[in-house]
């Protein structure tokens, strides 16, 4: 596994270095932080994913870094729209982590992994999933302020499959059957990406 991580990180660094042709040296800092937190996520004396930081890291490194970073490399600036779009994407991707942690909550508790669901309980996990999707949709309404009517209103359609998936998750409650919720959540994320 360590070899796979090393190969992946090396390839990511090589690809990331090509972005330096389009943007400045500050990308080196962002890239170094990405590599550092990739290792700190599950290794070291204080593995972040084992101590309830997984959700925060997902929002940062799957929301702000890729969405904002991509925009920055192309435009060499950062706008409030980019901040909101980055946060929306981070929240959506975190729904996938929440389903995973919800499914694994009992095993995580036994192994000492203190995810937010282990810390705050199964009921919290259910509503956390629902809240992430609703928050992402409602944040899209910000785009009305900028005159982007479709970017504000179309994503509200995401709420339908999100709530339906949440209801199924609550009914299934535990076990391997929750794997189907991972698939539905991924589908819902793709749907939101198309709508946005």
Segments the model singles out, each with a brief description of its role:
Residues 95-117:
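Acidic (Asp/Glu-rich) catalytic motifs at the cytosolic membrane interface
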Residues 1-23, 114-147, 186-195:
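Multi-pass membrane catalytic core of lipid/isoprenoid biosynthesis enzymes
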Residues 56-71, 89, 118-122, 182-196:
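Small-residue-rich segments of transmembrane alpha-helices in multi-pass membrane proteins
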Residues 35-45, 64, 68-69, 87-102, ...:
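Transmembrane alpha-helical segments that form the membrane-embedded catalytic/substrate-channel core
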Residues 23-34, 86-88, 151-156:
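Structural signature of hydrophobic alpha-helical transmembrane segments
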Residues 18-19, 66-73, 96, 139, ...:
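Alpha-helical membrane-inserting segments
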Residues 145-196:
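Extended hydrophobic alpha-helices typical of membrane-associated regions
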Residues 1-80:
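Intramembrane alpha-helical segments
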